[in-house]
Every structure is written in structure tokens, then in C-alpha cells.
Amino acid sequence: MKVEALETNWKQNVKCWGGNSFQAQRWFAYLVKQYTSKERKYHSLNHVIYMLSLAEKFKANVHNWMAFYLAIWFHDAIQNKLKANEKLSAQKCLEAIDELNLPADAHEAAQLILATESHRASESSDAKLFVDLDLAILGSSKEEYRRYARQCRAEYKIPNFLYRRGRIKVLEKFLQREHIYQSDLFRKRYEYQAQKNLNWEVEALKKGVSL
């Protein structure tokens, strides 16, 4: 999907929800700038496009599409080495919602974004679906997953031994859970492959094999 198509879709949605057209243009420009930063290898505009495309397939299962859509766009708006990325991204989302003059229901987007910090959702079905959507890449094909793993590595300018140690810790936390995915919808479609992919990467990292 080209940037022009993304922009058209963004503006149409904001207009449909009664938002401010001028602010829609400004915020879209901000988001594109954030996601096309040269430091971004995985958490880029392609990641947003991937999530938007997949979300359309599950749209019938989403209760608050406005919040869901906004959360996709803003969930990685702030991406640096700090631990507060999710919180800062959620705050930026709320700022945009207020300036866009969107309905009160849009504020739920912030909670969806915050749920990605631990990828353990509350009882909210939308939150479960959203965190699963953010992790959908884990259940992708072997080739696609390896590309994702390499992109994640490229975002960290640290020695290999430090990256491997931290990455293994993160992946093993997911593998220690009863399920990687929160929703039945994603478990049925992606759980098995996600388990295979994560186990492969952990073993590769422990052996020092190139991803």
C-alpha cells in the first residue's frame, strides 16, 4: 500500500468520525515521519501497513474500530531505547485525538496501546485482539519470521552478546506462557507456528548462528 493510499484512508476515516480535516493532515504527516525514520527497520511504516491489512480481515470481531484503527497507527509512534515507549505513544495518541476532535470512544485507543507493553491483555476482547495483532508476525512463515528477526536485530546498535542475552530473555518469556496469543482467533491460526519460530530463534541465538 502506497503512502497516498494510506493518507486517503486516514483522512476518510477521520472525516467519517467527525474529526478536523486540517489536523488530520498534520497528524498523518507526523506519523509518516515517525515511521519512516532511518533507525526503524522493523517498527516502520511497513509494520503499520501489515497490521492495518490484517486488521481488516478481523474487523467484524472488533467492537470499537475507531479506537482500534488509531491504536494501530500510534502504538509505535514513539520508538527509542527507553522503557516508556508504550506510555509515550499512548499519550501522543490522546493528544492527537483531542486535536482531531474525535468522539470520546476514541480514547480507548490509549488502553490498547498500553496493553502492548506486556502483551497481556485485560478482559477486553478488543485489547486481546490488538496485542495478538501486534504479535502476528511471530506466527508467520519461516522465511518471513527470519526477516523479522534480522530487522529487530538491526534496530539495536549494541554488541551481539548483549543483544542475544536480552532477546533470548524476551523470547523465553513468551514461550513460558501457556499461550503466546490471547484470543482464540489467533491461537487457532498462529500459535503452533509462533511456537516453532520462537524456539528456532532461541536455539539460533544460543548457538551464535546468524539469523
Predicted regions and their residues:
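Histidine- and acidic-residue-rich, metal-dependent catalytic cores
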Residues: 89-122
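Non-membrane alpha-helical segments in proteins
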Residues: 33, 37, 71-74
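Short, well-structured alpha-helical segments
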Residues: 24-32, 45, 49, 69, ...
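Alpha-helical scaffolds flanking conserved acidic
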Residues: 62-72, 105-112, 126-129
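An amphipathic alpha-helix signature
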Residues: 7, 11, 25-29, 52, ...
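Divalent metal-dependent phosphate-bond-processing catalytic cores, especially two-metal-ion Mg2+/Mn2+ enzymes
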Residues: 1-14, 36-43, 54-64, 101, ...
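His-Asp-centered metal-binding catalytic motifs of divalent-metal-dependent phosphohydrolases/nucleases
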Residues: 51, 65-80, 89, 112-117
